[in-house]
Amino acid sequence: MSPSAAEIRSAYDKAKQLLLDQCVSINGQSAHWYGELSTSALSTATAMMALLQVVKAGRSARDFEINADFEQLIGGGARWLVEHQNQDGGWGDTTKSMSNISTTMLCHAVLSMVSGQWSVAGAEDAVSCAKNYIDKLGGVEAVRRRYGKDKTFSVPILTHCALAGLVDWREVSSLPFELACLPARFYAAVKLPVVSYALPALIAIGQVKHHFAPSWNPLVRWLRNRAINKSLQVLERIQPPNGGFLEAAPLTSFVTMSLVAKGLVDHVVVRRGVRFLCESVRPDGSWPIDTNLATWVTTLAINALKDDVPESLRPDLMKWLLGQQYRDVHPFTNAAPGGWAWTDLPGGVPDADDTPGAMLALYHLVQWDVPYPEDEEARERHCRKFHQNSPPVCAANDGALKWLIDLQNVDGGWPTFCRGWGTLPFDRSSPDITAHVLRAIAIRWWDCFYPESLPLNTPPHHRRAFKKSLVYTACAAAIDGFGFLAKTQRRDGSWLPLWFGNQHAQDDENPTYGTSRVLMAYRDCRRLETNEAQRGASFLASIQNPDGGWGGAAGIAPSVEETALAAEVLLDFEQYRSQAFGGIGWLINRLYDGSLTEPSPLGFYFAKLWYFERLYPLVFAVSALRRSVEVSGPEEMPS
């Protein structure tokens, strides 16, 4: 039974307040949403290994001028791992994740070292159970099968195990760290065997492999010996001042353990990395997958609340977001100015998902969700008023839009970090990111210009002529973007996302998330009548569970996040509105039984590394409930 308009309004008000209560000020910063990323067995194991290598090299925290005890941190991590081992002997990436070969091999390796040096209750039994799990899945070959030709994660995992003496160095693939000495503009051309964000691992792990098992080819050995110092200079230059590469404990740990193992324990990159790891450990002895997604969850919250963001919060939120836009070329990915990262911390990198999120949030903070003008003259007045009333936001969004257009791939889609860097998944165009960019273009420009101003059948050579102004450039880019979405839609009408999955679905896919996000672009760009949008909506409606909720795919147990996304977008398809309200009812039940804020491990933090974020279910639910309030009206009963 669908909820009444009054029930929806009441539920929205309650959920909205829960979300607003999470907007806080810490350490004197402007109030914003911080969220909380899942703690991680993988992060904990790699951080422990990095510190173990430092201890093995004869260094203490005092040598690093750090107020910590390395052995206590290692012991605390070991106890946490023992306590959170799954019944099958393995570990998953989060405390809610099923076991996988990668995380289990990392945990097994570090606990093997710890149990041989310290007395940790249960460690020996944990090591034995983990070994049985690893042997059953196939060990090294199972890791290689999981990642295929992408060496971004398989080589670091095997390096970690080699440092524990459990894998022969000959099993660890060499990484061409000498390529890091090339100017950054050539990285795309040389097709690195790792994705763009893994350059630090390419350098450090490539060097430790070269140290322990150099190439048989004398010319390659000579070249790599010559490249050691210069590539280390690159590594030092791209490391953020707080030491945390991408604010990620795993990447920072892989770099640190590798450099220490090859004798560089006193190198500045190591010293910064160790400090970052010591400062990011949690009270229970574990490490999170990343420090935070503060910028990302703040923009999600603003875009969910829209004009319900309190007036008292708007100036500080706007100032905080504007202050995070990159004004200089980024030293890590060589990204041009104009983008936003997922965090306000130094390890962030501008990307094509957080940038449109920030653009949309700034627009909503200024616009207070002004209704879309119906006639062309009103749209032009609306646009002029927006420019006059908020020049800093317009300037920021124009800069971001130029940045996004320059990032667009030749296939019409958008990658995450770097245009045309390589062929590996996390550097290729993806539907969910492309859809997010299209939504930012729509709210920035198509509030004044119909998409029909540049028809879909416009010849390519005519489209290029529109580049005389940003608006036409944006429209041309958007049409190419919709072309990419049409090409990547699957036969069943769904789209697959890059950054989200579902561990219970086939191949860890999440067509519910991907299709919902793409349909939001069709909605915001007023293309719901297209064949692609209708097929996508039909797919979403077809996989709803009997209880009204949605999982990641057909027949998968529902989650708050997936139900909220699917229900919200289906509210705009009249033929599926009753099903959408069924999903809203499911969310309302979760609100009142206290499980609405229970997160699910749906996020991918690079290369099949799962995470969950505490605020995701609440933010997505608020967005869906708010839209259902608008659709149901003040008195109307949804049918």
Predicted segments with their positions:
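An alpha-helical repeat/solenoid feature that recognizes helix-turn-helix modules
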Residues: 1-12, 32-76, 87-128, 132, ...
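Surface-exposed extracellular loop regions of Gram-negative outer-membrane beta-barrel proteins
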Residues: 271-282
